[in-house]
Design a protein with these regions (language model features):
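A sensor for short, sequence-defined functional sites
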Residues: 83-202
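Switch/communication elements of ASCE P-loop NTPase nucleotide-binding domains
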Residues: 1-48, 265-386
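Conserved P-loop NTP-binding catalytic core
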Residues: 40-116
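Extended helical coiled-coil dimerization/tether regions that scaffold
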Residues: 169-292, 296-310
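Flexible glycine-/small-residue-rich
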Residues: 68-72, 159-162, 272-274, 363
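Short glycine-/polar-rich loops that comprise or flank the Walker A/P-loop
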Residues: 61-66, 72, 122-123, 151-155, ...
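Short beta-alpha junctions and helix-cap segments that line functional grooves
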Residues: 52-56, 140-144, 344-347
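Switch/connector loops and helix/strand junctions flanking conserved nucleotide-binding motifs
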Residues: 75-80, 165-169, 350-353, 368-373
Length: 386
C-alpha cells in the first residue's frame, strides 16, 4: 500500500500544493523553513498518525483539505480480507464485492507484463477538518465514509527529536511472527477476523495435542482457560445462580486480562564491553542514537515480505558525518524497494541512489507560502542545497 497522489490545501503555510505520480520514494528537499516537514505532518494527519491542532489551520480559519490517492495491491487486499477489515466475508470474491460497494471510489486496475496480470487498484479520498475539531473522509460519493479510516496504512515516523523507542517498538512488532501478532490482537483461535469472547470451545482441540506440540498462541489460550478455572469458574457459577434466582435473565461473563501487551514487551539496553553495566537508549549520545536508528532501519530492509506501511523520516542525516549520511541514503534506498519511504533532507549525500522522479524540491513563493516545483532539476537542487 502506497501513496500515489497528494493534494494539500490550507494546512499551516501551505495554501495549495499538489504532488502527482508519487513513487516508492518521495524525497522532499530544500533549504530550512521551506515547509518540508509541514508536508510530512499533513500526511500524518490525513493518515491518522497524529491529531489535528489549532496551529495547523491557516490564518483565515478555513477548512483543511488533504486529498490522497492510495494504491492497493492484490496482496494488500488479501491481507485486509484475512483480517476481516471492511467486510466480514471470508471468501475473497465475496469480500472484494462488498469492499467495492463500501468504498465506491476504489478503481480496480489490471496490468500485464506479457506473462502475468498484475491486479491492483487506487482509492481516492479527501481528509477534511474544520477549526471546531470535526473531521471527515470524503470520497466523492459520501460526505463521510467511515470505512476509509479502517484501511489506512500504518505510519512509522521519525522526527528530528529521534523518538527511537517508539520506532523500535513498531519495528519489533513487524519482526514478530504471525502467532505473536494474533496473541496481541486478542482474536479467536479458529477465526482471525473474530474477537475472542472466551467461550473456550478451542480447548477440546488443544487437548488433543501433546504439550510439546502446542504453538505459542494455543499455549496462551490454554493459560487463559487454566487461569479462568483457577480464579473465576466457581465464582462465576455462584454469581450466575444468584443472579437468576434474583430475577436476572442474562448471563454474567467474566474474563481475565493477562495484559499481553506488557508480557510481550521488549526491553532494550546498551551494554558496555568494558564495564558490567547497562544503559537505557535515552542515555545514548545523539550520534550513537542516529547510528542505532540506521541499524534498526537496515534490519527492517532485510525482511522478506512486502508490508502495508509507510516510513516517514525528517532529516535522516541529522547528527551524522558525510560518510554515514551516504550510508543512510543507501539504507533508505533499499528500504524503498520494500515499501514506501517519505523523507526530508537538505543534504545532497542522501540523494545519490534516487532518480529525479523520486525527488521533489520545496521552496517558498513570493508570499512566503510553501510550494513544490513541478519539474525536478537535480543540478538546481544541488546548487540550492549547497
Amino acid at each position: 500500500m502506497r501513496l500515489t497522489g497528494i493534494h494539500i490545501k490550507s494546512f499551516r503555510a501551505i495554501r495549495d500544493v499538489t504532488i502527482d505520480s508519487v513513487e516508492n520514494a518521495l524525497i522532499l528537499v530544500g533549504q530550512n523553513n521551506t515547509g518540508k516537514s509541514t508536508i510530512i505532518d499533513a500526511l500524518r494527519v490525513a493518515l491518522g498518525d497524529i491529531a489535528i491542532t489549532k496551529k495547523d489551520f491557516n490564518w483565515d480559519g478555513g477548512n483543511i483539505e488533504i486529498a490522497l490517492t492510495l494504491e492497493l495491491t492484490k496482496d494488500d487486499l488479501k491481507r485486509l480480507c484475512r483480517r476481516g477489515i471492511i467486510s466480514r466475508y471470508r471468501k475473497f470474491d465475496s469480500w472484494f464485492e462488498d469492499f467495492q460497494k463500501k468504498l465506491p471510489s476504489f478503481v480496480p486496475m489490471f496490468e500485464t507484463d506479457g506473462e502475468s496480470i498484475n491486479e491492483r487498484g487506487e482509492l481516492s479520498f479527501c481528509f477534511i477538518a474544520n477549526k471546531d475539531g470535526r473531521k471527515r473522509y470524503f470520497d466523492g460519493f459520501k460526505k463521510n465514509n467511515p470505512y476509509i479510516e479502517k484501511l489506512l496504512p500504518r505510519i512509522y515516523s521519525v522526527s528530528p527529536e529521534r523518538d527511537i523507542e517508539r520506532l523500535q517498538s513498531d519495528l519489533l512488532l513487524l519482526r514478530e511472527d504471525a502467532l505473536i501478532s494474533k496473541m496481541r490482537s486478542g482474536c479467536c483461535l479458529f477465526e482471525e477476523a473474530k474477537t475472542c469472547d472466551h467461550c473456550f470451545s478451542c480447548i477440546g482441540y488443544i487437548n488433543q495435542k501433546k504439550p510439546i506440540e502446542l504453538d505459542a498462541f494455543e499455549a496462551s489460550k490454554l493459560l487463559d482457560y487454566k487461569l479462568y478455572q483457577l480464579n473465576l469458574e466457581e465464582f462465576s457459577k455462584s454469581v450466575n445462580e444468584n443472579f437468576k434466582k434474583n430475577g436476572g435473565q442474562d448471563e454474567i461473563v467474566y474474563s481475565m486480562n493477562r495484559n499481553v501487551e506488557q508480557m510481550l514487551q521488549v526491553t532494550t539496553e546498551i551494554g558496555s564491553k568494558t564495564q558490567r553495566q547497562t544503559h537505557t537508549l535515552s542515555e545514548m549520545g545523539e550520534g550513537m542514537r542516529s547510528i542505532y536508528l540506521l541499524s534498526l532501519l537496515e534490519t527492517y530492509t532485510e525482511m522478506q515480505e512486502q508490508l502495508s506501511s509507510i516510513l516517514m523520516i525528517e532529516e535522516p542525516e541529522l547528527f551524522l558525518h558525510p560518510t554515514l549520511q551516504r550510508v543512510a541514503g543507501e539504507i533508505l534506498y533499499r528500504l524503498s524497494r520494500k515499501n514506501q519511504v517519505v523523507f526530508t533532507t537538505h543534504s545532497p549525500n542522501l540523494l545519490a541512489n534516487f532518480n529525479s522522479r523520486e525527488i521533489r524540491q520545496v521552496v517558498l513563493d513570493k508570499q512566503g507560502r510553501s510550494i513544490v516545483r513541478d519539474n525536478t532539476d537535480i543540478s538546481v537542487i544541488l546548487d540550492d542545497l549547497g
